[in-house]
Amino acid sequence: MTLTVTFWGTRGSVPAPGASTAYFGGNTPCVELRTGTNALLILDAGTGIRHLGYSLLERAGGKPIVADILLSHAHWDHIQGIPYFTPLFAAGHEFTFRGAPALLGGIEYALRAQMTAAVFPVTFDAFRAQVHFRALNEVERGDGYALKTTPLRHPGGATGYRITDGNSGAPALVYISDNELGNAEGYSSAPGWRDELVQFVRGASLLVHDAQYTADEYERHRGWGHSRYEDVVDLAIDAGVQRLVLFHHHPERSDIALSEQLAACQKRVSEKGARLEVLAAAEGTTLTV
């Protein structure tokens, strides 16, 4: 099975529009995933989902759009695009919000709360599409795909996803949006948490991972739930990943600075003698897995 991955939002924390971020993009996280059976999964719903909505309507040509929206967690940058996701306001479409059982209640609350009268002109109930909420099992199967989840190290909790062909188990996309690979003392993780994460990621064709901080930035933001890019490269190497995509870019990182960060990651791979392709997520980019 082929998985097709399109990046609609790549920035972390807050939108960062402007000339200096035009290449890699300023919208917050949203990734479109199409399976070999053309099932549609939407990973997170930051501001990038607004343009995805327009694209889906154009491609659908009046036919119903059906999708699962997998939300890693309910922090603003991962849900703030929902009120501007045009297909939700049209009858005939169907969307199911998915989240880990421990997080789903908070996700539904946050989605509704960001559309209350004090902060938005219409409520969540203004949607005309069919809307559902359904918890994700740790392991489950969908239309031609299999999905596994893992808890991430992020304040309030977050969820990572491994998506594969439903029959062969390959190829594998692993999506880990908000995850702190350092600061072991700051989380109640089991002693072998990193080994377990390596096994979850093991052999992925494509790993999309939060790489928000440089080493200096990280020291000022320990406990904020994001990773140094060096730690992300090391995880990908240890797990035998084929391609690593740096994601959840720092909102103040310019295209020039992000290109330098990417080059530093590629240099680290070379110095370790590893075989790993490293990319930086850019809005509008489509990758085939």
What are these regions (language model features)?
Residues 177:
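Conserved beta-strand-loop-short alpha-helix elements that form
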Residues 1-174, 182-187, 198, 255-289:
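Binuclear metal-dependent hydrolase catalytic cores
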